[in-house]
Amino acid sequence: MNFDWHVWLGTGASILLLALIVPYIKSIISSTTRPSAVSWFGWALLFAIATVAQASKGIDWSLAVPLISTLSTTIIAFTALRLGRAVWTRADGICIVLGILAITLWAITREPLTAIIFSMIADLSVTIPTIVKTYQDPTSEPSTLWVLYVIGVTSEVVATTDFTAYNLLFPVYTIIGSAVIAALTFRGRFWARG
C-alpha cells in the first residue's frame, strides 16, 4: 500500500473547510458575525462558476476549494438572509453590477482560463463589501475561522498534483483575499486592546 500524502492532506483540508461551516453559522445565529449578503451570495455563484470552469480542465484536489466553497457560501448566505443577519449597503449595488459584468464577459468567451480570471475579478467585486465592512468593524467577522479557512485552502493547494494555471489561479487568489480579511479582523482586535 502506497502512502500518498496528497490524498491525506487534501482529504484533511476538505474536512477542515467543511467543518468551518458550523461555527460560522453559530456565530451568525449568536449575532457575533454580521455577513455581507452581497459577498456571500456572490461568492456562492462565483465559486460555482469557478468549479465548473476548473473541472472542465481536469479534476484534482485543488477542485475541492471552489466545490466546498460553493456549498459553504450557499448555506451561509441563506442562513444569514433567513435570520435577518445579512448586511446590505449602497456600495454593494455597485459591486453586484461589476460582478454581473464579469460573469457576462465569462459567458461570452466560454474559455475556461478566461472564465477563471473573470470569476476572480467578479469575486473581488463581491469581496469588497466584506473587506470594507471588516475594516470598519473588525469584530463583525471571526478571526479564527478566517485563519483556519486560509490554512485549509493553502493545504488544498499544496495537495494538488497538477500545478497549472487552471488548478492554481482561483485557490491562490482565494488564499490572498481570505488572508486580507483575516488580517483586518486581527487588526481590530489588536487596536482595541491598545
Predicted regions and their residues:
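Alpha-helical membrane-protein topology signature
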Residues: 1-194
